[in-house]
Amino acid sequence: RHKSVIDDLQRTLTEQAGLLDAINRSMAVIEFDLDGMVLRANDNFLKTMGYSAEQAIGQAHRRFCTAEFGRSAQYTDLWSRLKNGQFQSGTFERVDGKGQPIWLEASYNPIKDASGRVVKVVKYAMDVTAKMQQESEANAKLQAIDRAMAVIEFNLDGSILTANQNFLTRMGYTLAELKGKHHR
């Protein structure tokens, strides 16, 4: 009977080790203590951020943030929530080892001990800088088109959804006068 329990536990541990290994292979992972000091960072994190282990371990989380964010109320709130066991996720602007902006799609995960007390925070992240740059370039192109051309948008039934300022100025209307009206 005990051998069966031990075998089940061994299988569970092996499976969990495999899952952790998969995460470490595919994601940037960093661990912080509750003061925001780096405890450990995997190779993916170090490579993504441009740091060596010696440069990262023992450093404050703020080191990876923009100076503005590191001094903000949002930063204080982030760590307050984490210390209270609240998971946080999103797209975060950070700064790499060369001082360049980098965008991370990340989750901050409070880790609790057996008594339910938060003891550290583990961050799982993926570099989405290229995606953010593409979105920024696409938005810049759309804004340039909006400034250069008269644009009006219609619903499938022919009613006006919106029009840009160039269209409104050239046609002598306000958006309120056109919105919802049929194009005829």
Q: How would you label these PLM feature ranges?
A:
Residues 2-5, 83, 93-99, 112-113, 117-127:
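PAS-family sensory domains
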Residues 4-14, 132-146:
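Sensory-domain boundary/capping and coupling elements
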Residues 29, 36-39, 151, 158-161:
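Conserved hydrophobic beta-strand signature of PAS-family and PAS-like sensory domains
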Residues 33, 42-45, 164-167:
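N-terminal capping loop/helix in small sensory signaling domains highlighted by a polar->aromatic N-x2-3-F motif
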Residues 45-56, 167-179:
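PAS/PAS-like sensory domain cap-loop motif
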Residues 55-69, 177-184:
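PAS-family sensory/regulatory domains
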Residues 106-108, 125:
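Sensory-domain boundary capping and coupling elements
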